[in-house]
């Protein structure tokens, strides 16, 4: 007969690695070309003037300047870079 209890099993005990999403440069802050402004899943924010979008929906600056957030009439959030 066994003198130790069985090990048992569980379906818990896993967690995914952090993805560090969110806004990396706030409105009014100065950025250089290529700087990441927002890391996101899906297009919560869309690129405006002088901003680009990566394949993972990351918004980045195309020129040196200041970050400007704006809303359109149909509730879209755009990010512009105002050249300095």
Swiss-Prot record:
GO terms for biological process: translation. Pfam families: Ribosomal_L27. InterPro entries: Ribosomal_bL27, Ribosomal_bL27_CS. PROSITE patterns: RIBOSOMAL_L27 (PS00831). GO terms for molecular function: structural constituent of ribosome. One of its GO terms (cellular component) is ribonucleoprotein complex. Belongs to the bacterial ribosomal protein bL27 family. PANTHER family: LARGE RIBOSOMAL SUBUNIT PROTEIN BL27M, RIBOSOMAL PROTEIN L27. This is Large ribosomal subunit protein bL27. It comes from Chlorobium phaeobacteroides (strain BS1).
């Amino acid at each position: 007969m066994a003198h130790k209890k069985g090990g048992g099993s569980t379906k818990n005990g896993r967690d995914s690695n952090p993805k560090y999403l969110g806004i990396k440069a706030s409105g009014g802050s100065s950025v250089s070309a290529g700087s990441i402004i927002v890391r996101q899943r899906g297009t919560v924010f869309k690129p405006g003037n002088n901003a680009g979008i990566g394949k993972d929906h990351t918004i980045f600056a195309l020129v040196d300047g200041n970050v400007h957030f704006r809303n359109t009439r149909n509730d879209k959030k755009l990010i512009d870079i105002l050249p300095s």
